[in-house]
């Protein structure tokens, strides 16, 4: 009986959240954002390279810069963002309830999340995959040697589900050691509460930076899942979905056409029709999106193109020093590809 009641309460909670999200969508997020004068952006509780406060308390990371790009497009000012730190368990409810306008929090795009929670994924701003980190003193070379291991993992994530799938598929046993936040998971691993830590591979490199002795840990070579990470908005609000989607597309197109924060003003004199449409000089401009004509220019001038953002936050210009890999543009051996602005 208790189990039936629990299932019923869960169903009611999901139903209530979806009703709330429908009401928010009907009112229109774009109008709400323009009226309040800022974008309410859901981020992580702290993951270097993606969303993390620096020593001055200022939020930084590739997910943070997406929110700044969105604010630049809509409000003409990248600083018009209010950041809401959320755990993995809290993130979707915060979006469904209207507490945030966009979720930009290293979130994996899955069928269930895209269809059953009243949400829309804007696109992918980082292609990732789940891996494992262990202490070097264990002498492990492969994840296939983790049979019987204890594994630190964050709750409410695809990581937790993938972990179970991987060990079951390999016929191995493990003991999960579950935490609510990435920081807690990292501390648990660092203090020896588990043999291995699992999360997205980019996250492993980020969390390793915060260990007492980063050189004591190594990331194993196996990638056990596909983790397309990207921003999320409420379902049913097509106008806001379009604005959020084309913000990311503009950053990708800007990199493809060589438009950067440093040369964007000079590029206004370009004869290339692709660049002129990107900067709002010709073409559809902001009419279809319901925002300023120079929205693309504002994104690039204030934040930069996708490549600039990547290198600054997780790439060569960051402590993570992650190679572009599959996150390079399609014409440079990667997956990143944006539809044309025309």
Per-region residue spans from a language model:
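Extracytoplasmic small-molecule ligand-binding "clamshell" domains
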Residues: 25-104, 291, 306, 329, ...
């Amino acid at each position: 009986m208790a189990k039936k009641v629990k299932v019923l309460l869960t169903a009611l909670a999901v139903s209530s959240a979806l009703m709330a999200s429908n009401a928010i969508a009907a009112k229109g997020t774009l109008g709400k954002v323009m009226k309040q004068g800022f974008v309410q952006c859901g981020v992580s509780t702290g993951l270097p390279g993606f969303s993390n406060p620096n020593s001055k308390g200022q939020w930084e990371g590739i997910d943070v810069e997406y929110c700044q790009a969105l604010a630049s497009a809509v409000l003409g000012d990248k600083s018009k963002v209010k950041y809401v730190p959320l755990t993995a368990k809290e993130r979707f409810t915060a979006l469904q309830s209207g507490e945030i306008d966009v979720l930009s929090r290293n979130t994996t795009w899955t069928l269930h999340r895209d269809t059953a929670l009243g949400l829309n994924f804007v696109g992918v701003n980082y292609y990732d995959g789940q891996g494992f980190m262990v202490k070097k003193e264990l002498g492990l070379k492969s994840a296939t040697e983790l049979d019987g291991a204890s594994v630190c993992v964050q709750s409410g994530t695809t990581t937790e589900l993938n972990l179970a799938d991987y060990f079951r598929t390999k016929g191995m046993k493990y003991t999960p050691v579950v935490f609510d936040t990435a920081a807690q998971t990292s501390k648990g691993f660092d203090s020896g509460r588990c043999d291995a830590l699992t999360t997205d591979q980019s996250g492993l490199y980020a969390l390793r930076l915060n260990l007492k002795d980063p050189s004591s840990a190594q990331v194993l070579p196996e990638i056990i899942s596909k983790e397309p990470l990207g921003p999320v908005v409420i379902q049913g609000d097509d106008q806001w979905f379009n604005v959020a989607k084309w913000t990311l597309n503009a950053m990708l197109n800007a990199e493809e056409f060589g438009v950067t924060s440093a040369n964007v003003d000079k590029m206004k004199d370009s004869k290339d029709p692709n660049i002129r449409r990107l900067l709002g000089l010709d073409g559809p401009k902001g009419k279809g999106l319901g925002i300023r004509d120079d929205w693309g220019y504002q994104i690039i001038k204030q934040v930069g193109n996708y490549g600039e953002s990547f290198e600054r936050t997780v790439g060569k210009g960051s402590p993570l020093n992650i190679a572009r890999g599959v996150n390079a543009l399609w014409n440079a051996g990667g997956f990143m590809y944006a539809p044309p602005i025309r």
